[in-house]
């Protein structure tokens, strides 16, 4: 890989000293945020609106944007002329060339609508038999990508009732163009593709504005130095950490954001921490960009926004933009639609393990079949996926050795606009804190929908969000693919993270994993509203803390095994 230029590295190295010489708004943090204003309204949208459209950007903001533009202009890897990024950024035209057509031109994405158990079972078996790429599925439909010349074979395995129950979502030139457009273009202006429209995607006024880092999807070679920059520029409340090492030897970087108490006379309680993760599935780029947007928004708002400042004083937030760095790099260099990690399997020509099927809780890779060529291959044993085990080991070490208590998990994925709570492995077993999970989930969905005119997200269990139902009584139809061994269930059940959610971001299928880059900021904005609502909920400003808890949940055993007073005796208004 070509390395960053000396000038760029020098800029990164001197950035902290340059920033130190710039007057910061956060210098007044210790006095201005220690006491919350009497007029503070935790439910007010304006309370966390940090935008000031008529105010010139501060010097540190201009400096950070200049550095980020420099990072973003660095050359990327193009070994053996196989880099997909080089193909996207090389030509001045925004039309895909022959290489793109040869790679994806024969594919089609079809949406099947199932009504009966026989139809669901037949589609599930056919997808497994033909090694098809199942993009998404829920109670209404299943989206499957396949080569067009495989379609006759697929229909031959399906009942006749399904022969007329599918429709193409993307095919031929449209699919190739959608893939091509997700890569950045060195020649395109920020307003590129302003006329793109989908019935499920409202045109956004934000696509040509805002931070330059979020005008495009970014490769890992840009994300990593950007994270280092954030840590260097905001030393009071940001620290870059390493979750672990991937199979191919890459770091799994994260940003820990929070302000720790300085009073050493009082015993230090376990630091309540919220995990916000993305990228378990490599091709879900919007999840990675959204985590970066959330981190940037929270980091920049500290000392300026009362609500976010208060949250960072009470909680740590750990932002992990990609838990699957090897797979993510592969989507930039070779195959945009790659899903799994990149470790070898028992079949030399079939690489990768589905990291979100590799966790040990209710792992069922042996029951679902062990086919390394499957997109949802769970490995031959629990934790065979290297990155899954590294993530779990890090989290356990945090709780056992570093005085951390994980109180929330938001694991971002795409697509289908759903907020999913445990369990994923079963539609029949109920989590002990079901009512609290449902209540908070509905609150998150409402915060997304109303605060910034966001989209509608469905709230349900992860199992019910990933199966089809035969009727209104929810007779569960056969699964399209396994949902055992998920990160969601593992963190909820094994690490006792009470508020654990998997959130599937925009859209509902018109673009699927190929969400236009113009939707990065709008998606980030609506998720920021969800994160702020989560914070209010955990602080007791909305939801469960206004009345007595109804759940059967038992807290992690940290000596006494009890909740603290605010949690154990909820306030009734």
Swiss-Prot record:
<feature type="binding site">
    <location>
        <begin position="414"/>
        <end position="415"/>
    </location>
    <ligand>
        <name>substrate</name>
    </ligand>
</feature>
<feature type="signal peptide">
    <location>
        <begin position="1"/>
        <end position="21"/>
    </location>
</feature>
<feature type="binding site">
    <location>
        <begin position="356"/>
        <end position="357"/>
    </location>
    <ligand>
        <name>substrate</name>
    </ligand>
</feature>
<feature type="binding site">
    <location>
        <position position="339"/>
    </location>
    <ligand>
        <name>substrate</name>
    </ligand>
</feature>
<dbReference type="GO" id="GO:0008270">
    <property type="term" value="F:zinc ion binding"/>
</dbReference>
<feature type="domain" description="Peptidase M14">
    <location>
        <begin position="216"/>
        <end position="538"/>
    </location>
</feature>
<comment type="function">
    <text>Inactive carboxypeptidase that may play a role in cell wall organization and biogenesis.</text>
</comment>
<feature type="binding site">
    <location>
        <position position="281"/>
    </location>
    <ligand>
        <name>Zn(2+)</name>
    </ligand>
</feature>
<feature type="glycosylation site" description="N-linked (GlcNAc...) asparagine">
    <location>
        <position position="397"/>
    </location>
</feature>
<feature type="propeptide">
    <location>
        <begin position="22"/>
        <end position="186"/>
    </location>
</feature>
<dbReference type="GO" id="GO:0005773">
    <property type="term" value="C:vacuole"/>
</dbReference>
<keyword id="KW-0964">Secreted</keyword>
<dbReference type="Pfam" id="PF00246">
    <property type="entry name" value="Peptidase_M14"/>
</dbReference>
<dbReference type="GO" id="GO:0071555">
    <property type="term" value="P:cell wall organization"/>
</dbReference>
<feature type="disulfide bond">
    <location>
        <begin position="350"/>
        <end position="373"/>
    </location>
</feature>
<feature type="region of interest" description="Disordered">
    <location>
        <begin position="23"/>
        <end position="60"/>
    </location>
</feature>
<keyword id="KW-0961">Cell wall biogenesis/degradation</keyword>
<dbReference type="InterPro" id="IPR000834">
    <property type="entry name" value="Peptidase_M14"/>
</dbReference>
<feature type="compositionally biased region" description="Low complexity">
    <location>
        <begin position="23"/>
        <end position="53"/>
    </location>
</feature>
<feature type="binding site">
    <location>
        <position position="284"/>
    </location>
    <ligand>
        <name>Zn(2+)</name>
    </ligand>
</feature>
<keyword id="KW-0862">Zinc</keyword>
<keyword id="KW-0479">Metal-binding</keyword>
<keyword id="KW-0325">Glycoprotein</keyword>
<comment type="similarity">
    <text>Belongs to the peptidase M14 family.</text>
</comment>
<keyword id="KW-0926">Vacuole</keyword>
<keyword id="KW-0732">Signal</keyword>
<dbReference type="GO" id="GO:0006508">
    <property type="term" value="P:proteolysis"/>
</dbReference>
<keyword id="KW-1015">Disulfide bond</keyword>
<protein>
    <recommendedName>
        <fullName>Inactive metallocarboxypeptidase ECM14</fullName>
    </recommendedName>
</protein>
<dbReference type="GO" id="GO:0005576">
    <property type="term" value="C:extracellular region"/>
</dbReference>
<feature type="binding site">
    <location>
        <position position="413"/>
    </location>
    <ligand>
        <name>Zn(2+)</name>
    </ligand>
</feature>
<feature type="binding site">
    <location>
        <begin position="281"/>
        <end position="284"/>
    </location>
    <ligand>
        <name>substrate</name>
    </ligand>
</feature>
